[in-house]
Amino acid sequence: MHVPQFISTGALLALLARPAAAHTRMFSVWVNGVDQGDGQNVYIRTPPNTDPIKDLASPALACNVKGGEPVPQFVSASAGDKLTFEWYRVKRGDDIIDPSHSGPITTWIAAFTSPTMDGTGPVWSKIHEEGYDASTKSWAVDKLIANKGMWDFTLPSQLKPGKYMLRQEIVAHHESDATFDKNPKRGAQFYPSCVQVDVKGVGGDAVPDQAFDFNKGYKYSDPGIAFDMYTDFDSYPIPGPPVWDAQDEGCCFIDGVDTTSVKEVVKQIICVLK
């Protein structure tokens, strides 16, 4: 078989082997192992389908299609809690995403500024990432499938209490041997999903400040976006900035404390000194 120059042999074989529908989206959130219930259009900005975003100029790159449509609830959590985002295509615990869709998974946070915020603009900080493990020759997506669509991460322990938008993103590289701007039929596939979270209780005073803008920060030339997974490689550069270090910020902050009270001011001072 003659293989056209614009597509590698490995990419063609993967294209022929994969099913027609192999996409995914987020359905639920767990806090410290407790299921918060079906989050579709409740606390998750749920897109109308499982299709990927490939255009880096699209506003849907931030929070997917319908990303600016309000949803009524927030997941309640505390700084330092373990959160689990649950992904699948149709059936819970099965049919997560096609194994050919190899790639990283990253998690981001932004201050919640408005019910209609769509995630565009310089508002995001990365709080977790996982890409390619050369020792096992496996991707984050492989781990997601093995875990039946469950992806764990921890909220920064020094995060200031308040309302936030959390964004998790899967990037699939089975067609990124060509970039979307050069060949719209191919390119890296982005699966972003945004969740409303209310961080309560005792935390720090760390406020996410990386100010990353997906439409400006992601480039078609980035080695973690224009990535040919069908060549030999032993490492992978995850797109975006490094993980935000919330520990750099500072002190304790107690949600809802009236610091006009001398007693509560003393509590704050003790918290800072710990």
UniProtKB/Swiss-Prot annotation:
Report the Pfam families cross-referenced here.
Answer: AA9
Any one Gene Ontology molecular-function term assigned to this protein's record: monooxygenase activity
Where does the UniProt annotation locate this protein?
A: Secreted
**Keyword Secreted, does the record have it?**
yes
Give the biotechnological use. Lignocellulose is the most abundant polymeric composite on Earth and is a recalcitrant but promising renewable substrate for industrial biotechnology applications. Together with cellobiose dehydrogenases (CDHs) an enzymatic system capable of oxidative cellulose cleavage is formed, which increases the efficiency of cellulases and put LPMOs at focus of biofuel research.
Under Enzyme Commission nomenclature, its number is 1.14.99.56
Binding site residues for Cu(2+): H23, H101, Y191
Name the InterPro entries on file.
AA9, AA9_LPMO
Q: Where does O2 bind?
A: H174
One GO biological-process annotation of the entry reads: cellulose catabolic process
- What Gene3D superfamilies does the record point to? 2.70.50.70
User: From which residue to which does the signal peptide run?
Assistant: 1-22
Predominant localisation class: secreted
Q: Which cofactor does it need?
A: Cu(2+)
Which keywords accompany this UniProt record?
Carbohydrate metabolism, Cellulose degradation, Copper, Disulfide bond, Metal-binding, Monooxygenase, Oxidoreductase, Polysaccharide degradation, Secreted, Signal
Checking CDD domains in the record gives: LPMO_AA9
The lineage's top-level taxon is: Eukaryota
Q: Which family does it belong to?
A: Belongs to the polysaccharide monooxygenase AA9 family.
Query: Its function?
Result: Lytic polysaccharide monooxygenase (LPMO) that depolymerizes crystalline and amorphous polysaccharides via the oxidation of scissile alpha- or beta-(1-4)-glycosidic bonds, yielding C4 oxidation products. Catalysis by LPMOs requires the reduction of the active-site copper from Cu(II) to Cu(I) by a reducing agent and H(2)O(2) or O(2) as a cosubstrate. Cleaves a range of polysaccharides, including cellulose, xyloglucan, mixed-linkage glucan and glucomannan.
What's the protein here called?
AA9 family lytic polysaccharide monooxygenase A
The protein's gene is named AA9A
